[in-house]
Amino acid sequence: MKLTKALVTLLALLRFNLVAPQAQAESEAELPAVQQLQAVDLAVYQTGEARQGAAADTQHVYAIDNFTLAKYEKAGGSLVARWQGIRGGAISHLNSCFAEKTQLFCANSNFPELPMASSVEVFATDSLRHIHSLSLGIMDEGSLTWFDRLGEGWLAGFAHYDGQGGTGFKDHRFATIYRYDQSWRRLGGWMMPDSVTRQMQPYAASGGALGADGLLYLSGHDKPEVYVLAAPRMGPKLIHVATISVNIEGQAIAWDDSAERVLIGISRSSREIRSFQIPPVVLPAGLFRLTEVNFTL
């Protein structure tokens, strides 16, 4: 009987050693190859303010600086409206915006102050007058850099930094993406994949926008790239499925919904707003679009 038990144990160990490497290989194989794609340049808009990002609607583009917004005509390039805050004021670091109907929704933070605090600021697109503010206060998530609609709620990105503006006990790897309901109650979220945070360090995502294809498009602080992420079948980390070369210098991006798959970004050095045709991204088998994820049990 003792010999039989020993043989059973030995066979179990041998079987484990044979299966474990195979299981590990299968797990590693679940990560798809990152698609390498190229955006096509479409248009350039000259501004004096585009240092943090840009937004767009059918007829206009919007330049974003720390406490300045400017509205320009697409057709002629004329300045239509401008909103100007004050240095050290309540709105001190506008990170990104997106246009929706008659409103411009913007992510604001107190960067580089500590502790990190954030707010959502809303402006009327006709005159750029400020019409609403939603304070998120101090959040463990980090500093709000971008947000977008997801269903009836919100998808938002929060930054942590290695240097200036960082807490000292959370580095760039703690940058997170969270899902909120329409009242900004947190429903869940994801880590960002290492292959993306490495490209953004020592900063985090400066811009983010959910595509019509249900995938998430992120831009970093300074690289001429946009990273495309999908939701995993299981686990807490988004999957990096594509990197798109884009003629920008990082900073915030937004979709121009007046055309299909047109993204806008900026050249910080020249303060230009630039638009691009973004190629289709193939969703690898076994992954999900963020719009397909169910945040209820």
Regions found by a protein language model. Name each.
Residues 42-47, 84-89, 134-140, 191-201, ...:
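Surface loop/turn motifs at the tips and blade-to-blade linkers of beta-strand repeat domains
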Residues 49-50, 92-93, 116, 141-143, ...:
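Beta-rich catalytic cores
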Residues 117-126, 171-184, 228-232, 278-281, ...:
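Beta-propeller blade signature
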